Amino acid sequence: MTGLFVGSTDAYGGKSLICIVLGLKLKRDGRNVGYFKPLGLLPARIEEQTVDEDAAFIRDVLELPDPLADLSPVLVTEELYRRAMTKRAGLNLADRIKEAYARLAQGREVVLVGGVGAVPTTGRAFGLEARRLADLLDCRALLVGKYESERSIDGILVSRDALGERLVGLVLNDVPADQLTFVREEMVPYLEDVGIKVFGALPHDPVLRSVSVGELADHLHAQVLCCPEQREQLVEHFIVGAMNVESALRYFRRMPNKAVVTGGDRSDIQLAALETASKCVVLTGDLRPSSQVVTRSQELRIPLLLTREDTLTIVDRIEWLLGRVRIREQAKIERATELAQEHLDFEALLRELGL
């Protein structure tokens, strides 16, 4: 059995995305693949248990039969950090992880082990940072490096040093289109010169960085005034509608797959947003829209999200959400699979793993 730990240079760097697309490829190839997330950071109530939300989602995507309790045996909470800091006995985290992994790995050819947070740091308080987990489970390690700028090289090198000989190679993620040539012609050769094998670079993609209308409504604690069946629609761009209606119409028409954020008293901007194929309209200030706006949104099946906060606060909360985008919707999974098939050399990775 081969175990592959998937970690990243930063939180929200693309670990789950890589686990999903690699897991689906292995299943298409007829391999018996499993998924394991030793540390969970997203507690959620599922099937009357408190489990890691990411682990439960990936289990469903890969159609795995394993019990949720085994998929992510340790949930990282504030209480766990307090217990670690006060050196209270009885944590036994490494034993719990190793025992759950042994049960899950039985009969499997490959187990993908999802990391959390950033490779060099997350889990250190418990002695369960990425390298320690890879050693504990005897896994090779694949690093996902989210590209921010040329300085991203520093985080990659620090993570390389942390993983040591466990590292099998690197996948670069979220590379802007205008940086792809630099990455392929300069950054990748440099990384390979310093001993890091690169299996490809995924370009930035607006679908993968989008959020669903439902996710947006939940995060903003918004009341969905109409069209709740459109919660799965994906929003790629956000526009604050603070201009006059003529300028708004010109601007809105140039921006596809958008959400417009505007005051609840701006019926003119709301109607302009509805008439230019927006994915939703976010109304701020707890001001309900006019009956004309509600009727038109129902006719066009475009949700209206009513929020209590002012526009500036809502924009801040949306920006926070955009920095923590997760793969949840089927459209994102399909797009990620397409990009991986085009830009990643998974065959080379599997050869490195002896598969």
What is the predicted function of each stretch?
Residues 104-107, 249-258, 273-277:
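Flexible, charged surface loops at secondary-structure boundaries
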